[in-house]
Amino acid sequence: MAEQITSARATAKIVRVAPRKARLVLDTIRRKSVNEAYAILKFLPNTSTEDIYKVLNSAVANAENNFSLDREDLIVKEAFANEGPTLKRFRPRAKGSASPINKRTSHITIVVAEKEAK
């Protein structure tokens, strides 16, 4: 028999947010219910919350449409940000020199799963 699928995932690639800053937000929503995660993201001041909100929304939509899971029973099982390609820029400095500026990007992944029955 086929095993029932109880989780769904969504990924956003090359998001223009430093992974370190995205992880600060992802750490706060990990292992929370989806509704609680939405509430947390709505009121956090970090700029990365908009991108993370979109990925969470996509993961929930994947769970509902692809696997017929109920939104009320979902929790954020995994949430992580890996480093994407770095955009390298240069700032002119004194005496004709230049300093590098690294504009970092992230790959944000969120996995939602059904709550385990106790």
From Swiss-Prot:
Protein origin, superkingdom: Bacteria
List this protein's GO terms for biological process: translation
List the GO cellular component terms.
cytosolic large ribosomal subunit
Which keywords accompany this UniProt record? Ribonucleoprotein, Ribosomal protein, RNA-binding, rRNA-binding
Q: Which Pfam families match?
A: Ribosomal_L22
Alphabetized GO MF terms? rRNA binding; structural constituent of ribosome
Q: Which family does it belong to?
A: Belongs to the universal ribosomal protein uL22 family.
Report the function annotation for this chain: This protein binds specifically to 23S rRNA; its binding is stimulated by other ribosomal proteins, e.g. L4, L17, and L20. It is important during the early stages of 50S assembly. It makes multiple contacts with different domains of the 23S rRNA in the assembled 50S subunit and ribosome.
The entry describes its oligomerization and partners as: Part of the 50S ribosomal subunit.
Annotated protein name in UniProt: Large ribosomal subunit protein uL22
**Record organism:** Leuconostoc citreum (strain KM20)
Q: Which gene encodes it?
A: rplV
